[in-house]
Amino acid sequence: MTETPLPGLPSAWLLGSPGRVLRVVLASAAVAPPGTGAAQHRAGRDAVGAALRRAGSPVTSVGRAYSGAPVCPAGFPASVTHSTALAVAAVAPGARGVGVDLEPRCPDLKLHRFLLDERERAELWPRGDPPGLRRLFAAKEAAFKALSDCADAHGGLFWRVRLGLRDGRLWARAGDRYALVGELAAPAFALAVAVTADP
């Protein structure tokens, strides 16, 4: 595996609610040129394996579910995201779910109409700027992955996951389940990590 650190990518992130802080371990891997789908998936598996190792898992090889999500050992939920150049994996030992998303490009601004509801636009995207929408797109996608077992609440559609601020932290909700979202934004990308937690 060729580890390619994303500038500013921490090796671990602490997310959680008071009294229950969860460690999310991150790892990245370069995607072999020319960045085909198969190369992205290989890099993703490599990144998940590295994150599992760092998290203390006795098993570091991963399978792949029909949905494309990594199949990991019990107690070590994982998520992966990739572009044509880089894969990033997150593992959250002991959590119910974890999600990660990397967005190198800003989405079309017209997407805000179905991506965000009126409250989310007012609270989280008041400037209406492209980097802000990219950041929220990544946050919703990461939260959707963390809350993947809430299909009855979000219908399998990531934009139905709702975001909001609580005590200065970004939370996601699908039905009665919550995930805490951490964000890392730079001029060239937005990265979000979400872990299931109780507010």
PLM features: residue spans?
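Core catalytic alpha/beta fold that binds nucleotide/phospho-ligands
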Residues: 1-199
